């Protein structure tokens, strides 16, 4: 599955638009890692446990979006975007969305 942030596919034509596809996940850290991150916040520096959590959340959200596009018979997603939001202390939602299309050589 081709996943692009652009609205077009260079050298290809859009044969059919299948529609909006999306994938989401809500992730949280366990209390031990959350406490460790709180200490890191006091002294500065990267909060590795949160970086890992968001990386995993992006991968899951994109994977779910791709699954939805494949179920529609699409071979690409264009205009892909990621949105994250904080839901509660230590929890974050990640949403991936885009337009599922079928492309062909131009």
From Swiss-Prot:
<dbReference type="InterPro" id="IPR002765">
    <property type="entry name" value="UPF0145_YbjQ-like"/>
</dbReference>
<comment type="similarity">
    <text>Belongs to the UPF0145 family.</text>
</comment>
<protein>
    <recommendedName>
        <fullName>UPF0145 protein CPF_0876</fullName>
    </recommendedName>
</protein>
<dbReference type="Pfam" id="PF01906">
    <property type="entry name" value="YbjQ_1"/>
</dbReference>
<dbReference type="InterPro" id="IPR035439">
    <property type="entry name" value="UPF0145_dom_sf"/>
</dbReference>
